Amino acid sequence: MITGRTALYGVLGNPVRHSRSPQMQAAAFEHLGLDATYVALPVEPERLPAAVAGAHALGFQGLNVTVPHKRAVVALCEAVDPVAREVGAVNTLRRTERGWEGFNTDAAACLMLLREEGLRPGAPALLAGAGGAARAAAWALVRAGAVLRIAARRQDAAERLAAELGPLAGPGTPAPVAVPWGALEAEADAAEAVVNGTTVGLHPEDAPLPLRVRAGQLVADFVYGDTPLARAARDAGARLVSGERILVRQGALSFALWTGRAAPEALMAAAIAAPGRAT
């Protein structure tokens, strides 16, 4: 039961009703005996400043931020963590007295999972997209030492992202390069790792990305659910970092930032996989 003592958390996005974050975070709160609740908050882009300010005024303790607000919310933060500043996007807000502190747990989660799946320094990698999620993925790939090529429907966005992340490339590692969207298939064929940072797969009617996946390739998809890319990766025998794994890991990192407690990650993963949960 929600009372005047219940700590409030939520996720801002548009669309956001499909989000599995509420049941995942609710399971973690319940497991640790915390009096807290987490809700999905649909917010259209033009209402984002009012929503962020209103959530602070209403006493929310923390927020996640999802499509399409991850870049726009940066300007609404009182302070921004160095990683989020490098990424140029924020997906987690933590309350301070004066406002919100912004973090990017997408980026940290992606880096951890890519390393766990054996992404080697110097590996050629292809990223599809240049929006908020793609920025987190690009940061993770560069920090992991991959030789990154970025393809986006808007070539200027891919070029801008490549230029911004270039200074982060390690000694001896080539800076990221933007490539045409039309070269996606050929670039994927040459890559050891392929990451989808677009929203392709979010809607059932979405056409798949125009690329092939092969056995042993490392494939990561920021969209969760039975996406075309996830199916292709499983069918081909690729190493898959699914959207669910990214969701759970970033959610666990957000939980720790908000509460100062280690998140029950296995339980959170089980919560989003349970029958009857939102998809």
Curated annotation (Swiss-Prot):
Residues annotated as transmembrane: none
UniProtKB keywords: Amino-acid biosynthesis, Aromatic amino acid biosynthesis, NADP, Oxidoreductase
Gene Ontology MF, one: shikimate 3-dehydrogenase (NADP+) activity
Pathway noted in the entry: Metabolic intermediate biosynthesis; chorismate biosynthesis; chorismate from D-erythrose 4-phosphate and phosphoenolpyruvate: step 4/7
GO biological process terms, semicolon-separated: amino acid biosynthetic process; aromatic amino acid family biosynthetic process; chorismate biosynthetic process; shikimate metabolic process
Enzyme Commission code: 1.1.1.25
Family matches, as SUPFAM superfamilies: Aminoacid dehydrogenase-like, N-terminal domain, NAD(P)-binding Rossmann-fold domains
Binding positions for shikimate per the UniProt entry: 19-21, 66, 91, 106, 224
Binding site for NADP(+): 129-133, 222, 243
Top EC class of this enzyme: oxidoreductase
Active site positions, chain numbering: 70 (proton acceptor)
Catalysed conversion reaction: shikimate + NADP(+) = 3-dehydroshikimate + NADPH + H(+)
Superkingdom of this protein's organism: Bacteria
Family annotation (Pfam families): SDH_C (PF18317), Shikimate_dh_N (PF08501)
Job description of the protein: Involved in the biosynthesis of the chorismate, which leads to the biosynthesis of aromatic amino acids. Catalyzes the reversible NADPH linked reduction of 3-dehydroshikimate (DHSA) to yield shikimate (SA).
Assembly with partners or alone: Homodimer.
Family: Belongs to the shikimate dehydrogenase family.
PANTHER family associated with the record: BIFUNCTIONAL 3-DEHYDROQUINATE DEHYDRATASE_SHIKIMATE DEHYDROGENASE, CHLOROPLASTIC, SHIKIMATE DEHYDROGENASE
Protein name: Shikimate dehydrogenase (NADP(+))
Organism: Anaeromyxobacter sp. (strain Fw109-5)
Species lineage: Bacteria, Pseudomonadati, Myxococcota, Myxococcia, Myxococcales
Name of the gene encoding the protein in the UniProt record: aroE
